[in-house]
């Protein structure tokens, strides 16, 4: 199983531009641009702690790792094969506060092994980022690849729950006690009301992730743990802008992660169980 970071909010296949137009037309303020003033400086004001990021080999996950490490946090970056991720290895060589760990979020033995290695280590922030779009292959009605449904559900929805259940004790021992999942507006019932076509398996997996995190927020409330889903926006992790390819609302990965870090830093008990865009706007479930 190849686990990659969710590289964008919407697919790049033929229905891509239609989906973008529908999203912008129907979501209104939900997809408004820059981070809100209330959260703009939250990350800078938050004392460094320990953060664990899954799916950290590239894209959004790697940018989370880079920014947190540069901000002085103790960072645990996980990937299926971190030793093969050149950018992670090079960053770890420069940053003594960065620890690389092997983790396959769909492999029970891999998760248990990480749980054992991290036993007794408090984690302030757990970011479930690992996920995949499967390049939207076989996700158009009439041409559905039914054998790929289970893959995306296991990786995008079940994987984060596996990891969270294994490490919840570490988070409870941390000071900040925050669990996040990088989701997508593709999994929002409110936004999908605009008629965005195709992408069935990816949408279903992200909708499932949203419900799992919402339910988890209720179960973990008595333990003082905050849980929320994050929408990174339509992120250019593939370098489209550098190649002259533009899409409405496309956002640079650095800006997206800066915004999400601010959201995480400012997350309060009243916001647990919500779906928040990198700009600070609350999204419809």
PLM feature spans:
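Catalytic loop of short-chain dehydrogenase/reductase
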Residues: 132-133, 139-153, 172-221
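C-terminal helical subdomain
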Residues: 222, 229, 237, 241-285
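Conserved glycine-rich cofactor-binding loop
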Residues: 57
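Conserved glycine-rich Rossmann-like NAD(P)H-binding loop of the short-chain dehydrogenase/reductase
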Residues: 71-86
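Conserved Rossmann-fold cofactor-binding substructure of NAD(P)-dependent oxidoreductases
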Residues: 106-120
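Structural signature of the Rossmann-like NAD(P)-dependent dehydrogenase/reductase core
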Residues: 53-54, 128, 178-187, 226-231
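Rossmann-fold cofactor-recognition segment
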Residues: 92-109
